[in-house]
């Protein structure tokens, strides 16, 4: 299923490695206290999502990621040799001769910038959703790790493969986007147009359970045909008691904005959800820069290919973080950085940049990305977008020379750099594959 979803761009060796190692990492999570739903017989209550041929997804109600994070953080806090710096923001990686030696880090509360030197540095900075604005990602998903790595010439790959989750809750009165899990369709929910047509069978034999790229592209086509602002997820035929047991957060969130799932369809539309590309790494998480590692959504491991299979990201993060640890633990402790002396960070000015400039440019970027570099792209839009983003990038470089560093400005700078990587990759790719589609592209992955 992973290979099919990845549409020919998965690294088969990586796929086999993750699938083989996955059960051990799951057991480790459970040993650390993660609790996953079980059926009446005490076995895992396995869910099914788009692209999966079987029920195989271990979950915790409709908050699996939260439960995994809770268990890992609790375990981390138990370790005396782990120190967590809250309210600290990494600005730049420290590098010399293609080798990373740590990072310059901003204390958000004191505005002090410190040098965090390290023999090895691991980026686990998550996704890039805020580049689009209309996203299921949190506000901190500004692509910081990818941008920092790019600035020290680490190789990035396949940044054009942006996964749009097909069913984010549509609601005009809210700026944040709430995710309606694909497991709801696996549970039996139907996608419908405003007129009630179940349209997915027109696009894929798997219907509502097709992979995310196909469902998102199909919804995009339907909305452009009809002029409607959303489609609908129909759960009115499902057992409401069973639904609330499986999806309590989805039920309560819909109810809070006046949607009665038992009687009403849920308005949904695609939103940016996941970056399938990222910082290129090998099977030990090593980047092209010595002593720099990357893991999770900011990395490109070869697992997802052109499109991620639902729920594979959590598995990937667990397997690769463990492999990075095992690799580093096998190396002799040389403490190379102690002999190195790096200059302190110097701000060009004591004055902060006008926040309205940052907010305006960020909003303009998000509108541009949504409009010109969305689910379906074309070269004329991409070339126009590239020109504008390059202009903003040059403006950011000039601003940095004149003003004091702030987290908000650096997030904007990182978002613009990531947007450039996405648009360049989109222009260079000349075939439709997985989650990538250009309407003026005649060649497809299956046309060879």
Protein language model regions, located:
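Alpha-helix capping and helix-loop boundary segments enriched in small/acidic/polar residues
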Residues: 63, 109, 113, 132-140, ...
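Conserved redox-cofactor binding core of oxidoreductases
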Residues: 30-112, 117, 124, 168-172
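A short alpha-helix-loop-beta-strand transition element characteristic
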Residues: 9-12, 26-43, 83, 155-158, ...
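An anion/pyrophosphate-binding glycine-rich loop and adjacent beta-alpha core
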Residues: 148, 154-266, 318, 327-332
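FAD-site-proximal beta/loop scaffold in flavoenzymes
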Residues: 92-110, 114-115, 259-301
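Glycine- and aromatic-enriched mobile tails/lids
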Residues: 28, 34-55, 192-208, 219-222, ...
């Amino acid at each position: 299923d992973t290979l099919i979803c990845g549409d020919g761009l998965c690294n088969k060796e990586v796929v086999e490695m993750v699938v083989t190692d996955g059960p051990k990492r799951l057991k480790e999570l459970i040993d650390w206290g993660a609790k996953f739903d079980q059926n009446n017989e005490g076995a895992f209550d396995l869910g099914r999502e788009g692209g999966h041929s079987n029920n195989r997804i271990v979950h915790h109600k409709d908050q699996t990621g939260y439960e995994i994070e809770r268990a890992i953080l609790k375990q981390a806090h138990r370790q005396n040799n782990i120190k967590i710096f809250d309210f600290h923001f990494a600005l730049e990686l420290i590098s010399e001769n293609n080798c990373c030696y740590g990072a310059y880090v901003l204390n958000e509360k004191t505005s002090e910038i410190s040098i965090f030197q390290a023999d090895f540095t691991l980026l686990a900075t998550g996704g890039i959703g805020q580049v689009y604005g209309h996203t299921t990602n949190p506000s901190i998903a500004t692509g910081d790790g990818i941008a920092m790595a790019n600035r020290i010439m680490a190789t990035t790959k396949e940044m054009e493969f942006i996964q749009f989750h097909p069913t984010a809750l549509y609601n005009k009165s809210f700026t944040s986007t709430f995710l309606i899990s694909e497991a709801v369709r696996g549970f039996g929910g139907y996608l419908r147009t405003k007129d009630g047509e179940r349209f997915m069978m027109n696009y894929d034999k798997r219907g509502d359970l097709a992979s995310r790229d196909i469902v998102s592209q199909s919804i995009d086509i339907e909305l452009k045909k009809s002029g409607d602002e959303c489609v609908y997820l129909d759960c009115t035929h499902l057992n409401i008691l069973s639904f609330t047991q499986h999806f309590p957060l989805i039920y309560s969130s819909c109810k809070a904005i006046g949607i009665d799932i038992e009687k009403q369809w849920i308005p949904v539309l695609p939103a940016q959800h996941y970056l399938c590309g990222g910082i290129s790494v090998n099977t030990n998480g090593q980047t092209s820069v010595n002593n720099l590692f990357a893991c999770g959504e900011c990395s490109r491991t070869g697992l997802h290919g052109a499109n991620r299979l639902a729920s594979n990201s959590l598995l990937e993060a667990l397997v690769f973080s463990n492999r990075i640890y095992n690799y580093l633990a096998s190396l002799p402790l040389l403490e190379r950085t102690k002999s190195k002396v790096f200059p302190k960070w110097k701000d060009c000015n004591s004055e902060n940049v006008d926040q309205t400039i940052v907010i305006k440019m960020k909003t303009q970027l998000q509108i541009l990305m949504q409009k010109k570099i969305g689910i379906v792209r074309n070269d004329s839009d991409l070339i126009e977008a590239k020109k504008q983003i390059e202009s903003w990038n040059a403006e950011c470089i000039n601003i940095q020379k004149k003003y004091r560093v702030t987290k908000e400005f650096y997030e904007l700078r990182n978002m613009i750099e990531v947007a450039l990587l996405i648009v360049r990759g989109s222009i260079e790719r000349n075939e439709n594959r997985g989650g990538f589609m250009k309407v003026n592209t005649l060649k497809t992955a299956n046309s060879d």
